[in-house]
Amino acid sequence: MRAKSKWLAIFLVLGLILAACGGDGGEEETTTTEGDSGATTEAPTETTEAPTETTEGGDMGEIATDVGVDLEAGTITVGLLSDLSGVFASLVQVIVTGQEVYWENVNANGGIGGLQVELLPVDTVYDIPTTVQRYEEIRDEVVAIGHSTGSPHTVAVNDMLQEDGMLAIPLTWYSGWSDDAINANLMHHGVPYCLEAMNVIGYISDTMGDATSIAIASNPGDYGLDSYNGAVMAAEALGLEVVYEGEGAINAADEATLTEVANGIVASGADIAWVTTSPGAFGSIFGQALAQGYQGVWSGANPSYNPALIAPDSAIKDAMAASSYWSSYPNVWGADTPGIQEATQLLMDSGRVDQPISAYFEGFVEAQIMHAALQQAYDNGDMTRAGVLAAAKSLEEVDFNGLAPNESYVGSNNEQVQRVSGTIFRPDPEALASGETAGEEVLETNYTHPITEAFEFNSACYSLEG
């Protein structure tokens, strides 16, 4: 496979996995050893109290541990619930590589108080029962879960996470991860689909100046409906009439539904079309509407887009460039920020990266959140699983240095929820063809529209039942 074809294929899988991510223990012994600080963070009450032993830890002050931290071996083990051989393996492997490169650099520079972080990835095959099985297999070996692919998959293990008092970082942008009714053991990151819709539709409306109507269509499930609900709220706040309602109407595997949605958008004559689905389904809907003369401005949740839509051999590349706007969660490859530049250098120096794929940065973001939690737990003197979770939930700010918008894990739902889109961009086929970037013309960075800023977030925009 030629290099350009190879990375376009990976980009295609990127869009597919991010869309599909929103598809439709007993007592533990706790050991205390010598460490830098005797202060401990109060652990969540869900965990079972366990007997405590004390051992000597050399120069470290008193450090409490239970599962996944071995002070004698000098290791911290973090699990990854990742699709490594299923339909989204090529993308998840990129994200896992990002984590591996990040932690290799941390370990080479002293680790966490001299402790080396070891990743334990297990293959969930993007299957809910397998995710549960893999969790059960590693639950007695890891201090936390640094990556969990898929919203329903993460919900399926959430009760066990709470039983174990264990932290996990989901790989989706469902707004429920910012809802304290759901997220006792989960760490959100990135602007949720719901608020992303407000940012992007607000930006498009302001840019157009004269838009009065919008067509909205989506996949079913948390991914599509979280975004759909955000688009409806954006329309109301902006005074846009919703002239086509395709709530959960898209089945990416059923071409008939794509045609029905395309026809509905065309018939509505909407000024703006917000379509949240997979990239392949988006391309089909876009192309069919274009062929019928539709001239509105397009967008959707970020997973609806990937650069394959503007590849040199794409029949819709020029129309996509002329009539669509998008957002990103982390920043993009080539962005002039310290965080992006540092991550890019580490990736290129690793010898495992030869194409500009921004998905690596997602691995860095996940790893940096876990790094902050582990470091705080170490500083607190409590590296039990409950201690790591408590430390994570005490983080007032995780600063990504421009890699992505900073995150906070204290305060109310409304105070914690991410409102900032990493970038607003337009597709750039010429830049993509050059092979030097992923084809984004960045229009705004760290963007928050006034309607998003004013939105009162108290609970998930869409209820995903476990």
Predicted regions and their residues:
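C-terminal motif of bacterial Sec signal peptides marking the signal peptidase cleavage site
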Residues: 17-20
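Bacterial lipoprotein signal-peptidase II cleavage site
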Residues: 22-30, 37-39
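Solvent-exposed, acidic/polar segments of extracytosolic/periplasmic ligand-binding ectodomains
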Residues: 56-63, 399-466
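Extracytoplasmic "Venus flytrap"
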Residues: 60-72, 79-100, 122-129, 149-152, ...
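Beta-alpha junction/loop-to-helix N-cap segments that form part of ligand/metal-binding clefts
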Residues: 63-66, 90-97, 109-180, 189, ...
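Extracellular/periplasmic Venus flytrap/periplasmic-binding protein
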Residues: 130, 176, 184-293, 334-335
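Extracellular/periplasmic ligand-binding modules, especially the Venus flytrap/periplasmic-binding
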Residues: 220, 229-232, 279-284, 331-394
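Extracellular/periplasmic periplasmic-binding protein-like sensory domains
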Residues: 289-364
